[in-house]
Amino acid sequence: MQGFKVAVAGATGNVGREMLSILAERRFPVSEVVALASSRSIGREVSFGDRILKCKALESYDFSTTDICLMSAGGAVSKEWSPKIGAQGCVVIDNSSTWRMDPDVPLVVPEVNADAAKGYGKKNIIANPNCSTAQLVVALKPLHDRAHIKRVVVSTYQSVSGAGKAAMDELFSQTRAVFTTDPVEAKKFPKRIAFNVIPQIDVFMEDGSTKEEWKMMVETKKILDPKIKLTATCVRVPVFISHSEAVNIEFEQPITADEARDILSSAPGCLVIDRREPGGYITPHEAAGEDATYISRIREDPTVENGLALWCVSDNLRKGAALNAVQIAEVLNNRGWLKPKRKVA
């Protein structure tokens, strides 16, 4: 079978490197993989399976013979380049927030709304959701199908890798500074992150919510159901990888914890670890490097009719970003919605 020519834009970043790794791990059918970055990173080396790729400049790359661009170069770059890339007949799967709420751009989590990807043709762009939204809707979808969700209250515990490599470096350097009694410098975050939690992710909006909280609300509606009410409190925690969420759900129909556990145990993308004993649950440390959305602490909420509570954890660099993008590419291939371009001899 002829493979796809795939470009990874932002290949030197956390998510870009993970995209390359996952393309190789999952043996996505490629004829060629091209690593792209800014002009200042030309020649930098990144890994693709057992091969080493040298980065080329996004600004001068010709996409006319490329089938898919996995875009993880940031919102400003995506806003400028994704339409140009799409106009050359290359499908962009974008990890930034730039295109998520565009009515002509599908916002896709394959376990939830894979059919939406078929509508990519208007702009040749498909949007990846916010990392915290992706794992949430994977957990909510099978429960929504069973008992119809009315309202969700979610508190997130988001790792620093969601803010990039510089944020991971800051947590490391601050932690070291605390133990060596050196001054603690906060540059990437508004306050110290080491041994602390910060109840702000992204900028504040007029109603007092942060943009991250707003993203979770509007993206869940677009992906899952516009009638679902959702409120979120998003918190940055001193963890390197994996986001955790405490989720409270109110349903229209009755559903027990046992029913929910059975449903989630067989749901695509979910892995239930829920033993009512010390350590019988998942933590972000254990989820790092894994593909699943892990569900624990499933229980009924006696304070609201038809209520459940649960704990949800996933690797934000994988399911929350890179893995989801590659899964979208797999949907396009497996369903025949995208064919490799014919190469001119």
Locate each region found by the language model.
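Glycine-rich, charged/polar anion/phosphate-binding loops
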Residues: F179-V184, K215-E219, L230-V235, A246, ...
